[in-house]
């Protein structure tokens, strides 16, 4: 019996092992039932690292095992107690004996061991289907294995029971908010972790249409430049992760915080040491589909992601803002913190945990972390403000690396979170609680003409290129400028060239030469000068209209004022800065005082404005075309005086204008009658009750071609606007094939005549003006090179501008001297009509002086007209006599007496 008891005790380990293992492996049916019993047992909720065998074999388990398992007590039970030497010995491997010294683990060794144990227990638990991802341990570890683990877990979940279907729902049905709001849902741990994983996977795997990894290249470029902003296209996010794109505008603050954390992990996975440069990566959202106007922002936009546009009118300096703040207890010098400072409220400690005192507390300047802070104000773009409305403005906050991304005068697109904050001054002013609103910027993009070109469709581009191949496109564009204004072809030609503009040059980044063409209109009252400016304001993509009487020097350039809240000096942009890359229109230019007028000298030539006030020394861009209108001294233009004697402007300001247009109100019975008919017909045609021609007033062909115009059909105004935008952005004409000798000869001739007549001074600026106008004429035809025709047109415009500013006594002789330049692209009939009108005017003056009255019929001998025509190389007048131009001006021929008659 002693031997049997010894053998029983010696074989007890083997017996215990067999009792556990044999029933589970006896048959496949039993194993499946046993697995069900295991997964549903109370041991599922036991804490880790405990002996789980007690939970697996509970009180109910053995009862089922005795019914279904093998019979252990019987005739063959002695076999269970037979000695098996290899199984009757405990394993000694890995066990430390009592007499052995065990070395104490270091911190790194202990951490590695615990990581291995956690990995083992996690795999063991998942193998049994007992635990879900992220519940036992922090699932933020081993990020490199997560995508693969996630796929394996989803595959296992499809094969397991109802318990694991809940896990699939939490991953696949993230859009099911379960009755919560979006902001509450994304703040929970489960959805927050899933959003983190999805966005991280999006950054790692998103490819473009060519198969290139988009964000790998962007992150590489970002790290090369040591930046901390990663731009994500909202359209790409919506295409891949539509749930995240749905959550983002509703809860932007929470989502962007998760995105920033995920982006930082992706960046550190690619560049592990990038945290030495920055500890934060900011995800910037671009191309948000819906663009809101500043005046349309309402309370429903609060705390949502919005996209708006406007012009920056003022900006503060870059200030340090508290990010992570630490406090010193003044009584015990204990350091409290760090406290994360948010934009909405100030965080202050209540009591000191060391001495239990309630303060006072001082900010620890050395250990506190700051971030960059800048406040800007954006205003609605001038072209988007409805008539009679004041432009709205809104403040925006730029943080981190967004500071100094724009300056006053820039037109920007701003994506950010629309916040409200408490403002005590508003409560005092209104008498009841209201909140001020502000935009916390997330992404800032400068707008230029490329955005305008991007709005053109393929059909528009095809139509524009087709129009450029028309031989008469130049005349059509000239005729399309202000078609509701009668006559003034030279002014329309100059304004058309100014709208297209030349090409700016900056050789080596040292000296910048402007490409914009400045135009000055001067003449008698009632000659449509202001109407021309108003027309340019409508047809230009970006225009600022101001008057000389109401504009001061700082109103035109820029000024410095103290911010009412922060009490610091801020820079405010004036009209010329706001019109950057556009047109600045100044009416009543002569009403400005000299001090205000000299302030725009730099803006008109160097196209920049230097500010040195209140400690702010800077330079702002003013790359705009200046078109001004002025009245002569005394109200009417005196042709017996030169231009500079008629206008109260100094020579430096006159020489900065490329084109000078003199508008004179001369008495001509025929022209006056035609003008009156034109005006009356225009009023009748555009009356609101006239429904028949309603379509023409909305951008169609406004007026029929008049005989004194270019004789071609004008372009619709919308087509003209698109044509100008396309030409200014896509065409860059070069001067390779330009006739330089012709320009040099003409410049020397102009200098001689200028010195002899004492009229406006001719300077080197006029050579640059001719080059700019030649480039503008080439751009008008969408040509890449300046041709001889472009140079001839520029010389003709320059000559007409120069001759119109002369005294009447020298104007005729000068026209004869420069006739070869003035005759370019002019129809012979136009030249002959001009000569014939001069002969009629001389005859009218003769009759008034001799008879004291004017006769109803003026007779001009054909021989006089023939002699004048031969001087400009025109020998055949039959085509002129048969033309409509001859008949429309009420001329007729008496063939017997060989006279030309005009009836008044």
Curated annotation (Swiss-Prot):
Name of the gene: Mcm2
CDD domains: MCM2
Descriptive protein name: DNA replication licensing factor MCM2
Other observations noted: Early fractionation of eukaryotic MCM proteins yielded a variety of dimeric, trimeric and tetrameric complexes with unclear biological significance. Specifically a MCM467 subcomplex is shown to have in vitro helicase activity which is inhibited by the MCM2 subunit. The MCM2-7 hexamer is the proposed physiological active complex.
Phosphotyrosine carried by residues: 137
Biased composition (Basic and acidic residues): 76-85, 111-125
Molecular function via GO: ATP binding; ATP hydrolysis activity; DNA replication origin binding; enzyme binding; helicase activity; histone binding; zinc ion binding
Residues modified as N-acetylalanine: 2
One protein family per Pfam: MCM_lid
Functional description taken from the UniProt entry: Acts as a component of the MCM2-7 complex (MCM complex) which is the replicative helicase essential for 'once per cell cycle' DNA replication initiation and elongation in eukaryotic cells. Core component of CDC45-MCM-GINS (CMG) helicase, the molecular machine that unwinds template DNA during replication, and around which the replisome is built.
Annotated source species: Mus musculus (Mouse)
């Amino acid at each position: 019996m002693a031997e049997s008891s010894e053998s029983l005790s010696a074989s007890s380990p083997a017996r215990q092992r067999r009792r556990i293992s044999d029933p589970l492996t006896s048959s496949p049916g039993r194993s499946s039932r046993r697995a069900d019993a295991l997964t549903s047992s109370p041991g599922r909720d036991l804490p880790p690292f405990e002996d789980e065998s007690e939970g697996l074999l509970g009180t109910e388990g053995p009862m089922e095992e005795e019914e279904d398992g093998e019979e252990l007590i019987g005739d063959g039970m002695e076999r269970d107690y037979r000695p098996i030497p290899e199984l009757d010995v405990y394993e000694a491997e890995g066990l430390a004996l009592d007499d052995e010294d065990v070395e104490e683990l270091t911190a790194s060794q202990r951490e590695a061991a615990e990581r291995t144990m956690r990995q083992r227990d996690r795999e063991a638990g998942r193998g049994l289907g007992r635990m879900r991802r992220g519940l036992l341990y922090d699932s933020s570890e081993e990020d490199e294995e997560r995508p693969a683990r996630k796929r394996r877990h989803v595959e296992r979940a499809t094969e397991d029971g109802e318990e694991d279907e809940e896990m699939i729902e939490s991953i696949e049905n993230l859009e099911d908010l379960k009755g919560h709001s979006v902001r509450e849902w994304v703040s929970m741990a489960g959805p927050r972790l899933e959003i983190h994983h999805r966005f991280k996977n999006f950054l790692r795997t998103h490819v473009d249409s060519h198969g290139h990894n988009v964000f790998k290249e962007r992150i590489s470029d970002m790290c090369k430049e040591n930046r901390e902003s990663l731009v994500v296209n909202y359209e790409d996010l919506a295409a891949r992760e539509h749930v995240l794109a749905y959550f983002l505008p509703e809860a932007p603050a929470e989502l962007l915080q998760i995105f920033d954390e995920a982006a930082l992990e992706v960046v550190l996975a690619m560049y592990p040491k990038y945290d030495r440069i920055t500890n934060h990566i900011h995800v910037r959202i671009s191309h948000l589909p819906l663009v809101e106007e500043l005046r349309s922002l309402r309370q429903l936009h609060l705390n949502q992601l919005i996209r708006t546009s406007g012009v920056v009118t003022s900006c503060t300096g870059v200030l340090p803002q508290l990010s992570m703040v630490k406090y010193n207890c003044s009584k015990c010098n204990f350091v409290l913190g760090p406290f994360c400072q948010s934009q909405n409220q100030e965080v202050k400690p209540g009591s000191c945990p060391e001495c239990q005192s309630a303060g006072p507390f001082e900010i620890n300047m050395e250990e506190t972390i700051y971030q960059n802070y800048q406040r800007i104000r954006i205003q609605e773009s001038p072209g988007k403000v409805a008539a009679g409305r004041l432009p709205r403005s809104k403040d925006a906050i730029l943080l981190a690396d967004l500071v100094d991304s724009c300056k006053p005068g820039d037109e920007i697109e701003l994506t950010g979170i629309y916040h409200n904050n408490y403002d005590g001054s508003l409560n005092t002013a209104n008498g009841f609680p209201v909140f001020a609103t502000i935009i916390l910027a997330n992404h800032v993009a400068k707008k230029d003409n490329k955005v305008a070109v991007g709005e053109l469709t393929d059909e528009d581009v095809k139509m524009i290129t087709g129009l450029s191949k028309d031989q008469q496109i130049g005349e059509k564009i000239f005729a399309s400028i202000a078609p509701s204004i009668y006559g003034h072809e030279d002014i329309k030609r100059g304004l058309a060239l100014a709208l297209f503009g030349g090409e700016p040059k900056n050789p080596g980044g040292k000296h910048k030469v402007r490409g914009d063409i400045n135009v000055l209109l001067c003449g008698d009252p009632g000659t449509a000068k202001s109407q021309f400016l108003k027309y340019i304001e409508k047809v230009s993509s970006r225009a600022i209209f101001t008057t000389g009487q109401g504009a001061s020097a700082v109103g035109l350039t820029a000024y410095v004022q103290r911010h009412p809240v922060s009490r610091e000096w801020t820079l405010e942009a004036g009209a010329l800065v706001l019109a950057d890359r556009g047109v600045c229109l100044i009416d009543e230019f002569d009403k400005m005082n000299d001090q205000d007028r000299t302030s725009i000298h730099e803006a008109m030539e160097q196209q920049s404005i230097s500010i040195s006030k209140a400690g702010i020394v800077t330079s702002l861009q003013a790359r705009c075309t200046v078109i001004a209108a002025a009245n002569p001294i005394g109200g009417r233009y005196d042709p017996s005086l030169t231009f500079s004697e008629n206008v109260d402007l100094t020579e430096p300001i006159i020489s900065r204008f490329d084109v000078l247009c003199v508008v004179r109100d001369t008495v001509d019975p025929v022209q006056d009658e035609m003008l009156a008919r034109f005006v009356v017909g225009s009023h009748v045609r555009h009356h609101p009750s006239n429904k028949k021609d309603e379509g023409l007033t909305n951008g169609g062909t406004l007026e029929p071609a008049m005989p004194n115009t270019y004789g071609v059909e004008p372009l619709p105004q919308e087509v003209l606007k698109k044509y100008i935008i396309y030409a200014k952005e896509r065409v860059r004409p070069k001067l390779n094939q330009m006739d330089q000798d012709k320009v040099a000869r003409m410049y020397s001739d102009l200098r001689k005549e200028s010195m002899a007549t004492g009229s406006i001074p001719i300077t080197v600026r006029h050579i640059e003006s001719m080059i700019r106008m030649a480039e503008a004429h080439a751009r008008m035809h969408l040509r890449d090179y300046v041709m001889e025709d472009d140079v001839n047109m520029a010389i003709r415009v320059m000559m007409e501008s120069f001759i119109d500013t002369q005294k009447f006594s020298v104007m005729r002789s000068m026209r004869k001297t420069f006739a070869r330049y003035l005759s370019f692209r002019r129809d012979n009939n136009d030249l002959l009509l001009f000569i014939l009108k001069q002969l009629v005017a001389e005859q009218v003056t003769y009759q008034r002086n001799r008879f004291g009255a004017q006769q109803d019929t003026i007779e001009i001998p054909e021989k006089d007209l023939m002699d004048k025509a031969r001087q400009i190389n025109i020998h055949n007048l039959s085509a002129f006599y048969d033309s409509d131009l001859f008949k429309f001006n009420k001329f007729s021929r008496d063939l017997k007496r060989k006279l030309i008659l005009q009836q008044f």
